[in-house]
Amino acid sequence: MKPSMLSKLDQLAERTVEINALLAREDATANLDQYRKLTREHAELEPVVAQYAAWKQAEDDVTTAQELLADPDMKAFAEDEIRAARERMTTLEAELQRLLLPKDPNDHRNIFLEIRAGTGGDESALFAGDLLRMYTRYAERQRWQVEIVSESASDLGGYKEVIVRLVGEGAYSRLKFESGGHRVQRVPATEAQGRIHTSACTVAVMPEADPLADIQINPADLRIDTFRASGAGGQHINKTDSAVRLTHLPTGLVVECQDDRSQHRNKDRAMQVLAARLKDRQEREAQAKEASARKSLIGSGDRSDRIRTYNFPQGRITDHRINLTLYKIDALMDGDLGELLGALAAEHQAEQLAALGEEA
């Protein structure tokens, strides 16, 4: 193992001892935010430190067995022990290298998931509704909380645009590769001739911003408009100006929220979405600069990229980034996304490992 990697692992082992001591103090829960940060850090370090302990044990086993080589009666046994221990060390080192890959600081965050109907008119809006159901069912399987923040329903059902907040540990880490263009090929319910139509939606996955640390919004940069919330077809659902539209003047970003009867709560939610969009914008600009140096297949998150095709007549979903086709469209549309999301995460890790190899 490289000296730099050994040094890093020793530091992490020492840090784990420090965290254990801090968590064992009587006043450990006096500051709940700090307590949560420590427990999260401990959960991240624990598997690394456990694997490192196993690697060191295997190294000790090699040393012990080598001392037996001089004994003719024990030589064959010692050689077998050395071979087995070195194989364990090789396996553990590869796993440790994976565990030490740079972590995305947003991985633990809640997310705002935005789905917009694109080309295809009413069929695209219906597909936006299908995508929302797919992600909602997946969230339910993870025992996450789902909140609709903003919705613009279409006349025939589905959504022109919908934003939901998904609350749960690791929400961003699981769904961050869903940003991009989603294309559907199927016979629309409104199609009398039975012809297959192609339409598309755009999905954006944005980590929830920390209001204190991530994004500071100057009130002078905002224009705040209030208006009456309306339902499908333009009917008014209440008689007060409870709906809120925020315009961020420097960037031109606009957020509307009208799902709550309280203007105050609608404004709070709109501010949360705006902060997430601003954070997302900053990070995508940074990623674009990085991508100019090294093109990432999985993690570009470019909204214009067509990432996936849902072909209903053939019963398949194809993710174009990793050339993966799964012939179980009904299960996938019902939220059974584990295999697909796992394959994307594995490919991303492979890219990271390859990049580390290039740097070495």
Curated annotation (Swiss-Prot):
Checking SUPFAM superfamilies in the record gives: Release factor
Q: Where in the cell is it found?
A: Cytoplasm
What SMART domains does the record point to? PCRF
Any one GO CC term of this protein is: cytoplasm
Give the residue range of the signal peptide: none
Q: Which residues form a coiled coil?
A: none
PTM field: Methylated by PrmC. Methylation increases the termination efficiency of RF1.
In this chain, composition skew of type Basic and acidic residues spans 280-293
Q: Give the matching PROSITE patterns.
A: RF_PROK_I
Keyword Cytoplasm (UniProt):
yes
The record's annotation in InterPro entries points to: PCRF, Pep_chain_release_fac_I, Pep_chain_release_fac_I_sf, Prokaryotic/Mito_RF, RF-1
Classification via Gene3D superfamilies:
3.30.160.20, 3.30.70.1660, 6.10.140.1950
Q: Enumerate the GO terms in the molecular function aspect.
A: translation release factor activity, codon specific
Chief location = cytoplasm
Question: Which residue ranges does the record annotate as region Disordered?
Answer: 280-305
Q: Which residues carry this modification: N5-methylglutamine?
A: 235
Q: Which UniProt keywords apply?
A: Cytoplasm, Methylation, Protein biosynthesis
Q: PANTHER family annotated for this entry?
A: LD18447P
Q: Which family does it belong to?
A: Belongs to the prokaryotic/mitochondrial release factor family.
What this chain does, per the entry, is described as:
Peptide chain release factor 1 directs the termination of translation in response to the peptide chain termination codons UAG and UAA.
Report what the protein is called.
Answer: Peptide chain release factor 1
Organism, scientific name: Ralstonia nicotianae (strain ATCC BAA-1114 / GMI1000)
Q: Which taxonomic lineage is given here?
A: Bacteria, Pseudomonadati, Pseudomonadota, Betaproteobacteria, Burkholderiales
Gene behind the chain: prfA
